[in-house]
From Swiss-Prot:
This is LexA repressor. Belongs to the peptidase S24 family. Transmembrane segments: none annotated. Keywords: Autocatalytic cleavage, DNA damage, DNA repair, DNA replication, DNA-binding, Hydrolase, Repressor, SOS response, Transcription, Transcription regulation. The record marks 81-82 as: Cleavage. Its EC number is 3.4.21.88. Homodimer. It is an enzyme of class 3 (hydrolase). The active site is at 116 (for autocatalytic cleavage activity), 153 (for autocatalytic cleavage activity).
Length: 201
């Protein structure tokens, strides 16, 4: 998808408006921001962006613009040192799954590596649907970060101690010392996908 410089500017404006207002801009707002003579010029640029697959236009709505990259769920691969888990450099494409199929809704997919959770049916290569949150209840399966390593384990808190429990007797629990390692809960498991899933990008 090759965009002209102007199309890229408009796409960036749509993204920034979504981040600030929580909604896409109107044609009038785009025209005003870029000094177009009328909203029709903005409409022409939007149609060009839609034709190139960067956005989806929803007729009948003044703010009926949807970013294609918002469709589906991002797959997180290896997590770059020091980066947020949803940083662009960690993403390995997007998959055609509706986030609202999960409760609470899924924010990303994580490819499972290893056999530490096989006793609860989570196998190497599965896609784990994860709701991004730093809050988790005792006993929930979490995606946790220990320094720069991301792991999937069951959370257990007892006597002021945090333990990450594997669901495989071959693996010892991980006892977390927050003084010694950089520990953070990145999310909770809300579903599991195994088998063919359509990739969007």
């Amino acid at each position: 998808m090759k965009l002209t410089p102007r199309q890229q500017e408009i796409l960036d404006f749509i993204k920034s408006t979504l981040e600030v207002l929580g909604a896409p801009p109107t044609r009038m707002e785009i025209s005003s921001a870029f000094g177009f003579a009328s909203p029709n010029a903005a409409e022409d640029h939007l149609k060009a962006l839609a034709k190139k697959g960067a956005i989806v236009l929803e007729p009948g709505s003044a703010r009926g613009i949807r970013l294609v990259e918002q469709l589906g769920l991002p797959l997180i691969g290896s997590v770059a040192a020091g980066s947020p888990i949803l940083a662009v450099e960690n993403m390995q494409g997007r998959y055609a799954l509706d986030a609202s199929l999960f409760a609470p809704k899924a924010d990303f997919l994580l490819k499972v590596r290893g056999l530490s959770m096989i006793d609860v049916g989570i196998f190497d290569g599965d896609l784990l649907a994860v709701h991004k949150t730093n809050q988790a209840r005792d006993g929930q399966i979490v995606v946790a970060r220990l320094d720069e390593e991301v792991t999937v384990k069951r959370l257990e808190r007892s006597g002021g101690q945090i333990r990450l429990i594997a669901e495989n007797p071959d693996f010892e629990p991980i006892i977390v010392d927050p003084e010694a390692v950089d520990f953070a809960i990145e999310g909770i498991a809300v579903g599991l996908i195994r088998g063919a899933v359509s990739k969007l990008s």
